[in-house]
UniProtKB/Swiss-Prot annotation:
Subunit structure, as described in the record: Part of the 50S ribosomal subunit. Contacts protein L32.
Gene3D superfamilies: Ribosomal protein L17
GO biological process: translation
Ribosomal protein keyword on record: yes
GO molecular function, one term: structural constituent of ribosome
Organism encoding this protein: Beutenbergia cavernae (strain ATCC BAA-8 / DSM 12333 / CCUG 43141 / JCM 11478 / NBRC 16432 / NCIMB 13614 / HKI 0122)
Record's keyword terms, sorted: Ribonucleoprotein, Ribosomal protein
Region (Disordered): 136-197
Keyword set includes Ribosomal protein: yes
Bias (Basic and acidic residues) ranges: 188-197
SUPFAM superfamilies noted in UniProt: Prokaryotic ribosomal protein L17
Lineage per the UniProt record: Bacteria, Bacillati, Actinomycetota, Actinomycetes, Micrococcales
Name of the molecule in the record: Large ribosomal subunit protein bL17
């Protein structure tokens, strides 16, 4: 008997499972978003991402590998001409699984699996920031004596700036503390005068 695949078993036998995943992948590439059970979505994700990776290569051998799973030539054409170019800059994570409410009939946990077609701009900004930080670190390594003195004076100035702020807050706390006992003393005096009457 063949070793079962990792993850939940989806159908009766291995052939049924392969065909079910192939049909799910075909529907995903055709509609770019499908609703299915969580177990099927989790099993579909690695297959779909591997097929998109083949499509990003774009050669004939990759197209034939994809055609062994996805039998619809129109969907394969869409995958290679529209979806793969949209994912060209993305290094992975081509799909997104979002859990939705349970199915009405049998209360099965449902999920939406969709292709992530948004551009990858936030990552590019992070990469640019990281390269700038690397350049700054290289400059500091070249001339470490002068920036250290500047940092020390900046640190002294910041400590001096913080110290008056702490004194101001301490004065406010003391003033509030001074007012509170006086109010309490007046209230006590009124109570004692009421009891004497």
């Amino acid at each position: 008997m063949p070793t079962p695949t990792k993850g939940p078993r989806l159908g009766g036998g291995p052939a049924h499972e392969r065909l079910m995943l192939a049909n799910l992948a075909t529907a995903l590439f055709e509609h770019e978003r499908i609703t299915t059970t969580e177990a099927k979505a989790k099993r579909l994700r690695p297959l779909a991402e591997r097929l998109i990776t083949f499509a990003k290569r774009g050669d004939l051998a990759s197209r034939r590998r994809v055609l062994t799973v996805v039998k619809d030539k129109g969907v394969v054409h869409t995958l290679f001409t529209e979806i793969a170019p949209a994912m060209a800059e993305r290094p992975g994570g081509y799909t997104r699984i979002t859990k939705v409410g349970p199915r009405k009939g049998d209360n099965a946990p449902m999920a939406v699996i969709e292709l992530v077609l948004e551009p990858l701009s936030p990552k590019q900004a992070t990469v640019a920031e990281a390269t700038a930080a690397t350049k700054r670190a290289a400059k500091k390594a070249d001339a470490p004596q002068e920036p250290v003195a500047d940092e020390a004076t900046d640190a002294d100035e910041s400590v001096e700036d913080e110290a008056p702020a702490q004194d101001d807050s301490a004065d406010e706390v003391e003033a509030a503390a001074d007012e509170t006992p006086a109010d309490d003393a007046e209230a006590d005096a009124e109570k004692s005068s009421d009891t004497e009457k």
